[in-house]
Amino acid sequence: MQPKYDYDAIIIGSGPGGEGAAMGLTKRGARVAIIERYDNVGGGCTHWGTIPSKALRQAVSRIIEINQSPLHGNTRLPHTGFSDILCHADQVINQQTHMRQGFYERNHCQIFTGEASFVDEHQVQIHYGDNTTETLSAENIVIACGSRPYQPQDVDFDHPRIYDSDSILDLKHDPHHVIIYGAGVIGCEYASIFRGMNVKVDLINTRDRLLAFLDQEMSDALSYHFWENGVVIRHNEEYEEIKGLDDGVEVRFRSGKRMKADCLLYANGRTGNTDTLKLDKVELEADSRGLIKVNSMYQTAARHIYAVGDVIGYPSLASAAYDQGRIAAQVIIKGQANVQLIENIPTGIYTIPEISSVGKTEQELTAMKVPYEVGRAQFKHLARAQIVGMNVGSLKLLFHRETKQILGIHCFGERAAEIIHIGQAIMEQKGEGNTIEYFVNTTFNYPTMAEAYRVAALNGLNRLF
């Protein structure tokens, strides 16, 4: 009997969300087509977001480490330009693309390279680069088309000195001074990268403190570290006009201030890539930022059409997007999912040094009137940190005074995003498995950064009476 549809599922986008859905479906025998608008798979995560920015950060971090190491005396590395370290990022991108292409090929996912748009509830049209089209049909459709940097209409992003977080990866000159408008995660990460290359950085924050969703101590630590390293932060500022010049960019603010720099990176928000999908054909609509509303099983208002990843908004993390795609695949196959996204998703912010956290902040616990206590460990007191010259950083554990249950973990310092997982694993244990006493009663390798958990746990338990 001829199948009713060409495929069991069409997935629009090949980033982490699309990949998670595709692997979850093909492993269960489903026929899957993937429509990717760009020539290579991987989505924004691989080509413009997570992978290249973290590769840049790694290169800059190593340059800083070598230049500051006492082992090298007064020897410093020769000046390395932005375009030079981009070569390292390109190598990583190529490796990631090749690997992910292999995933799809081995699992018999058919990839179509073109722009997708809905024809009706079960049909999607592909617009190819040669102006031809093809229409595919499927019983289920997964929208995993990601997001792009938000571009306000009154800013000329065609000007060669005005960039967003995608186009900054094509920076051809070596700026001496950069203005970064937007002090969210992306803005702070690039502030670290540029300052690490001895570029003068003005970081414009439209709010009253950096990364307000973080525990305030972590936010304050980042602000202090930026200040100590020469990043100038301007809080509560909004632009009146951003004007491209022959040799740079001038910004006029509503407060009356004016600034000029070699270039400007606009990093103030993102918008979903839904404007070309023709969602009206399936009676769906996106909000003002291009985001699609879904239920707990990632179904849209049309129950056989799913959406995962950045296109549904929070938490907008590559790690979460992959799991969302995997959960959507389960729902498509079984009608329900036997797993769900964990409640406490760790955040990793790849500034120099890193910040990572999972669970509640002190401010949240205080507002909830939870009787908690705090345990702290300073990296500079740990043997491993002293060996590698890691003088900056701390680990902070929040736990219930009576049950000893871990409620939140916050880390500031090199490799924070790796260190956080030790605590996360214990925090996710059920019942009595989640206890701060685990870190006191367990033997870790020594000397390692895991020692921070023992020190912080003892520090916190010693506060109890």
Swiss-Prot record:
Q: What does this protein do?
A: Conversion of NADPH, generated by peripheral catabolic pathways, to NADH, which can enter the respiratory chain for energy generation.
EC primary class: oxidoreductase
Q: Which residues bind FAD?
A: 36-45
The record's subcellular location field reads: Cytoplasm
User: Which reaction does this chain catalyze?
Assistant: NAD(+) + NADPH = NADH + NADP(+)
**Free-text cofactor note:** Binds 1 FAD per subunit.
Classify the source by domain of life. Bacteria
Protein name (Swiss-Prot/TrEMBL): Soluble pyridine nucleotide transhydrogenase
Is Flavoprotein set as a keyword in this record? yes
User: What cofactor does this one take?
Assistant: FAD
Q: Name one GO molecular function term.
A: NAD(P)+ transhydrogenase (Si-specific) activity
Known EC number: 1.6.1.1
**Keywords on record:** Cytoplasm, FAD, Flavoprotein, NAD, NADP, Oxidoreductase
- What gene does the UniProt entry assign to this protein? sthA
Per the UniProt record, the lineage of the source organism begins with: Bacteria, Pseudomonadati, Pseudomonadota, Gammaproteobacteria, Enterobacterales
Its chief place of residence is cytoplasm
GO cellular component terms given for this protein: cytosol
User: Alphabetically, which GO biological process terms does the record hold?
Assistant: 2-oxoglutarate metabolic process; NADP metabolic process
Q: Organism source for this protein?
A: Sodalis glossinidius (strain morsitans)
Against NCBIfam families, the record matches this protein to: PRK05249.1
Query: NADP: is it a keyword of this entry?
Result: yes
What family is this?
A: Belongs to the class-I pyridine nucleotide-disulfide oxidoreductase family.
